[in-house]
Regions:
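N-terminal capping segments
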Residues: 1-66
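Intrinsically disordered, low-complexity, charged/polar segments
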Residues: 133-137
């Protein structure tokens, strides 16, 4: 049951899959979480370690679960050409963030909320070494 005044919105299929993965995290030390290694298999990199950056691997894996072809790349910024740019984010849309001047550095996840002051909430992989919902500016 929804609380009074709570918005009811349809959750895109890919976002429902992503929500189900919240809490998946890296194994400290020499071990590797098999689920994160599985995410990597959705990319051409096919990494076998949870120490390899995996935000794009997670996004590709999520899309694959619902029959949508992602970028196939482990590079976060590969998603910049996968979809069309939006002037305002839509619940569940892909968010790509640049990091520094390195053209390969970035982060990708799924938009879940705006908080004001240019802050957004993103559900993504490899956020503090886990699948989480985190705040970004």
């Amino acid at each position: 049951m929804n609380a009074p005044g709570q918005n009811i919105r349809e959750v895109p299929a890919w976002l429902a899959v992503a929500f189900d993965e919240v809490g998946t995290k890296e194994i400290p030390g020499d071990g590797h979480n098999p689920r994160i290694v599985e995410y990597h298999q959705a990319t051409s990199l096919k990494a076998t370690s949870d120490e390899v950056p995996w935000c794009s691997s997670f996004a590709n894996w999520v899309m694959k679960q619902v029959g949508i072809k992602g970028t196939g790349s482990a590079a976060a910024r590969s998603w910049m050409t996968w979809c069309r740019p939006l002037t305002r984010p839509v619940y569940g849309c892909i968010v790509v963030m640049k990091r520094g001047k390195n053209p390969g550095a970035g982060h990708v996840g799924f938009y879940v909320a705006s908080l004001g002051d240019n802050h957004i909430r993103v559900l993504g992989g490899n956020q503090s070494d886990a699948v989480t919902i985190a705040t970004f500016r």
